[in-house]
Amino acid sequence: EIRLSLVGSEMCIRDREKKVLVIDADPQANASSGLGVNIKEVECSIYECIINEADIREAIYTTDIDGLDIVSSHIDLVGAEIEMLNLEDREKIMKKVLAPMRDEYDYILIDCSPSLGLITINALTAADSVIIPVQCEYFALEGISKLLNTIKIIKSKLNPSLEIEGFLLTMFDSRLRLANQIYDEVKRHFQELVFKTIIQRNVKLSEAPSHGIPAILYDADSTGAKNHLALAQEIITRNSK
């Protein structure tokens, strides 16, 4: 999987003048825990901003990385999509929530769950571009076609400026024939849109949240941290052209 908390950390470390905001819109809260945030102690989260119209500024928490802030997830996000059904312009709520922050940060990274529910649709409607993670596993390519179809619909009806930032291969193990086959197939289909960076399987990244510190500060020399550093650099390079 891709860890946006790490990508954001690496962006700020690589370029000290960059300001990055991570929005954790996944109920599993991996981005929040990856940046040392205990969501049980959070008083204002992305949930309050979406459902209760809380000011986004009240939900922003500073992290231990200079220039990197986060709006954390909350367990109540699990039921948020049902609560959103009765709201006006429900697909555009997150876009409205994030609007005041667009000029405050160089990058806003929105972490979503893999499911194509209303929260993910909100994120795609609010975004300028989308990174598509491709797990090097059996049904990966099937999932891509569904997501691409959703992006096409959102682009035509909700967000005409939405672009594909790139396809990112994750959970890669070069020893597995299947992983290499998926890599070849994705590269053949999407060519220049595929990131040069590949995120390899890595255990160290999973250990950091249990220590309550950002993953990049837990083990900067791990393979996973180095992969995410390369990805951050690639994103910065692509966006500076």
Task: Show which residues each predicted segment covers.
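P-loop NTP-binding core
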Residues: 3, 9-241
